[in-house]
From Swiss-Prot:
GO cellular component assignments: membrane
Protein's organism: Methanococcoides burtonii (strain DSM 6242 / NBRC 107633 / OCM 468 / ACE-M)
Note: Reduction reaction proceeds via syn addition of hydrogen for double bonds.
Name recorded for this polypeptide: Digeranylgeranylglycerophospholipid reductase 1
SUPFAM superfamilies referenced in this protein's UniProt entry, alphabetically: FAD/NAD(P)-binding domain
InterPro entries found in the cross-reference section: DGGGPL_reductase, FAD/NAD-bd_sf, Geranylgeranyl_Rdtase_fam, Geranylgeranyl_reductase, GGR_cat
Length: 408
């Protein structure tokens, strides 16, 4: 193992591997470090991802594709069902992945691009000189190593320490963390072309239950609950009750638990010599908790900017602003909007959720614009419309900001 690289990437999830591959293809020497002994383990997500954005990063392969969904069904507490086509249902609807194989495939592509990869490599600190990150301290097989680099990318997930070590505030309040549990359940008789989202305070207070088909009558059945809404009953207990009530003939064959940031993006994701990507940068969707597409996009931008900065021999925060601007300009508005949606919808009573669902269940979402949505909300619940006023204000600002830029 070398002791000096152009770039060190901490974490080998989708964000880290895409960043490493992108940088290596542009000629950088890259080391990617993963603290776990197996890539892709444990799986802590529903494994859904939108088609278009996935295909921008990797060619489809049946070995990690479990299925394809064409719609999302949202079920309110009283059973009212809203059906949305995949293009209207968010970045988690389209393909269902086998994340274990998918993540390993991304890392294999990194290796083919020339990236050095180490597993069971735990980063314990950063090397910081003259207020600039210039490497990492890490442990591997009981030994301590110092690896110097021109730049570090932190892709170390929701538990990220890399940003904090560099002085970036990545702290999360209980209301900004989704505590999650997921079962892989066999014997599930559902429409394999749809994924399902169950709302309501009885099934998931401050969150929702998801069901993603994986073929052969199997499905990922999971739950996410805001930490601020967690009471004595644990998420896994809510999930067990849901499975017993809805899939009495199902068998739980895998079980995982974890957490997802639901805070919206942190104030900044860069420092001198450092960029943060994916969950480490809190780039997941704060409403749905989904983050694969955003993570891959962020990894691409970070890898590109890493190559540009090193070519200029300048890894200052000023130069790395290119990364900050690219990802915020790409999907930052969507995250900001969905943070408002999360804070509104997760505070609603079951009666409000039912009222909203009944009001818009026959709406053609393809033809619905902001005015249609406001009208539907007004019909459903004036209080809800008032609570969502920050979202409407923000979306109007974004719309007219775009028009102003176009006119220029």
């Amino acid at each position: 193992m070398k002791d000096q690289y152009d770039l060190v990437v901490v974490g080998a999830g989708p964000a880290g591997s895409i960043a490493a591959t992108t940088a290596a293809k542009k000629g950088l020497s890259v080391l990617m470090l993963e603290k776990r002994q197996e890539i892709g383990e444990p799986v802590r997500c529903a494994e859904g991802v939108g088609k278009k954005r996935l295909r921008q990063h990797i060619e489809l392969d049946e070995k990690w594709l479990c299925g394809e969904v064409s719609s999302a069904k949202i079920i309110s507490p009283n059973g009212t069902t809203l059906t949305m086509a995949e293009e209207d249902a968010g970045s988690e609807v389209g393909y269902v992945l086998d994340r274990k194989i998918f993540d390993r495939t991304l890392v294999e592509l990194s290796g083919e691009a020339g990236v050095d990869i180490m597993v069971k490599a735990r980063v314990t600190g950063l090397i910081i000189e003259e207020n600039t990150v210039c490497g990492v301290e890490m442990m591997h097989l009981g030994k301590t190593y110092s690896i110097r680099s021109k730049l570090v990318i932190g892709a170390d997930g929701v538990e990220s320490k890399v940003g904090r070590w560099a002085g970036i505030d990545t702290s999360l309040k209980p209301s900004h963390i989704e505590t999650c549990a997921q079962f892989l359940v066999s014997g599930v008789d559902i429409d394999q072309s749809s994924c399902y989202f169950y709302m309501g305070n009885k099934v998931a207070p401050g969150g929702y239950v998801w069901v993603f088909p994986k073929g052969n009558n199997m499905a990922n059945v999971g739950i996410g609950i805001l930490g601020s809404r967690a009471g004595e009953k644990k998420p896994i207990e809510y999930l067990t009750d849901f499975v017993e009530a809805n899939y009495p003939n199902g068998s739980i064959i895998e079980q995982v638990a974890g957490a997802v940031p639901a805070s919206g993006p942190i104030e900044k994701t860069i420092a001198n010599g450092l960029m943060l990507v994916g969950d480490a940068a809190r780039q997941s969707d704060p409403f749905t908790g989904g983050g694969i597409s955003n993570a891959m996009d962020a990894g691409l931008y970070a890898g590109e900017v890493a190559a540009e900065a090193i070519a200029q021999d300048d890894v200052s925060e000023k130069i790395l602003q290119k990364y900050e601007k690219r990802w915020r300009g790409s999907f930052g508005n969507e995250i900001a909007n969905n943070l408002i949606v999360k804070e509104t919808f997760f505070s609603l009573s079951d009666e409000d959720l039912d009222s909203l669902a009944l009001s818009i269940k026959d709406v053609d979402f393809k033809k619905m614009d902001l005015i249609d949505f406001i009208a539907a909300l007004f019909k459903a619940n004036k209080k809800l419309l008032w609570n969502l006023r920050p979202l409407f204000t923000q979306k109007l600002k974004q719309k007219f900001s775009g028009l102003t830029k176009f006119k220029r």
